[in-house]
Amino acid sequence: MTVFSPLSAPRLNRFVLLALLCLPLAACATEDQKAEKRLAAEIAEQEPVENLYNRAAKRLDDGVFFDAAKLFDEVDRQYPYSQWATRAQLMSGYAHYRNMRYDEAVMALDRFIELHPGDESIAYAHYLRALCFYEQIVDVRRDQRTTELALENLQRVVDRFPDTVYARDAMLKIDLTRDHLAGKEMEIGRYYLQRNQHQAAINRFQRVVDQYQTTTHVPEALHRLVESYLALGIRAEAQKSAAILGYNFPESRWYKDSYALLGDKNMPAPKRSVYDRTLGRLFN
């Protein structure tokens, strides 16, 4: 009879969990392999380029993005020096993007950008490349390398193609991306603050104030600086942060908290928000 040691149970569970996590990836790989075999059977060598390209475009219109990407790649492979190949490289990137295969999309777009830097669609290629990173932004508790790449690529679109519709949309996404990066700094700062590592917390909160001034996290960052400096007994710096908070965000709940925390009658009292004033008129 087989006897399982209690000491081996956690390790066994880890193996089971790992196997379960790998199941979706294995299923996805199997489906891709089936699709590739099916496509290989229907693709003829030296098929007329127009037919091959139109077939790829039809799959794209039908939402069969994996097939579309592979067929566009086939156009590029069979007719590498044609005008069809130039368009197919870009469309392959788009099809991979729609299929959420962002690494493959970036590879296809990099090829297009390298080979055709003067193409009329080059701004769109850079914009689509930026979106490949933007769509992968995850919550602030995870590594933000992808967020940084999104910001870098979106900024490139704005800098290189400022008068395009892509630049205008990129600017909106830059604001959201910067807000996300500021959120990550706040998450780390709170972590340090909760563990009484006040100098480390101050560094994070100050970075939000200095580098992400237009984000929604600045009022809280200033209040957390007040908390951190008071915890270290540096009241003058706490008052300075509170003064900046009160000047820029006098109606903020964070200024109210800082005002109460400092108990400094020389500081301007927090202003009532428009919401509070409206309620006061309604019920008084």
Label each residue range with its predicted role.
Residues 1-28:
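Sec-dependent bacterial lipoprotein signal peptides
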